[in-house]
Amino acid sequence: MTNSSSQLAQLKQMTTVVADTGDIEAIAKFQPQDATTNPSLLLKAASLPNYQGLVKDSVAWAKTQSDNAEQQVIDAADKISVLIGLEILKIVPGRISTEVDARLSFDTSASITKAHKLIAMYNEAGISNDRILIKLASTWEGIKAAEQLEQEGINCNLTLLFSFAQARACAEAGAYLISPFVGRILDWYKKDTGRNDYASNEDPGVVSVTSIFNYYKLQGFNTVVMGASFRNIGEILELAGCDRLTISPQLMEELANSTDTVIQKLTACEATAEKEAALSQAEFRWQMNEDPMATEKLAEGIRNFTIDQVKLEKQLTDLL
């Protein structure tokens, strides 16, 4: 059965579609509500020809902030993430997610300090807090940083989320939004089991996000569920109806080119469950330790974001 409108247009009727890219042209093409960036996407964007002016501007700005070479690199990296965010905000009507340096993932106070710095840079450019999400890894320390930032009126996007324990702790901390990963969970199970083909509705990443979504709605948590890290459009279509989905330009293109009917799979139920006592740090760490997939994928995600952050800083160092 086909529909006269594209799958992307149909999906937008039931889910807020977010662009998972730093590429302005791709964002302009697909007209998402919001956009998300991360160190890997920023590295990619900073290599694009049309961003070289921004790269130079960030380096020039960093030189005015400090005489210390190491500090200049850090400042330039923060500035480029904000400058790219500002360009994206000219196109999207909603929010930009900008990530805190992954090397701070186990340091609550340093994460809060970095978040304040990023927010101040956006504010100085005339952007109010309600258009920004600060991205933090869903470590215990990242979740605690988000808890404090939310109390200050700074909304957070908790990323690298692979487990129910992480999702529960984020909601209990009052996080504005979580980004539970789908494709990376599938990657782990494929490697672990040697099984290569999963029907979309049996995809372990899809199952994980579905259970988190249903739990949040049942418990009456306001934290937004934004599925992330997709490997194919089958995963996306199985999560139609999720609060938000952040999708790469390549997969948005596939959805835009298909007119097959999109069926809403997730629907918010009435909140009927009594809230449980909040997870303690000990319970959180124990549950994470019991989940090898989440433990390995969280650690790997932090390492990989750090690798790309360092590559970006190397590019900037060469210009300083």
UniProtKB/Swiss-Prot annotation:
It catalyses: D-sedoheptulose 7-phosphate + D-glyceraldehyde 3-phosphate = D-erythrose 4-phosphate + beta-D-fructose 6-phosphate. Pathway: Carbohydrate degradation; pentose phosphate pathway; D-glyceraldehyde 3-phosphate and beta-D-fructose 6-phosphate from D-ribose 5-phosphate and D-xylulose 5-phosphate (non-oxidative stage): step 2/3. GO terms for molecular function: transaldolase activity. It is found in: Cytoplasm. One of its GO terms (cellular component) is cytosol. Gene3D superfamilies: Aldolase class I. Its main location: cytoplasm. Its EC number is 2.2.1.2. Keywords: Cytoplasm, Pentose shunt, Schiff base, Transferase. The active site is at K135. Pfam families: TAL_FSA. Signal peptide: none annotated. GO terms for biological process: carbohydrate metabolic process; pentose-phosphate shunt. CDD domains: Transaldolase_TalAB (cd00957). PANTHER family: TRANSALDOLASE. Homodimer. Belongs to the transaldolase family. Type 1 subfamily. Transaldolase is important for the balance of metabolites in the pentose-phosphate pathway. NCBIfam families: PRK12346.1, talAB. This is Transaldolase. The gene is tal.
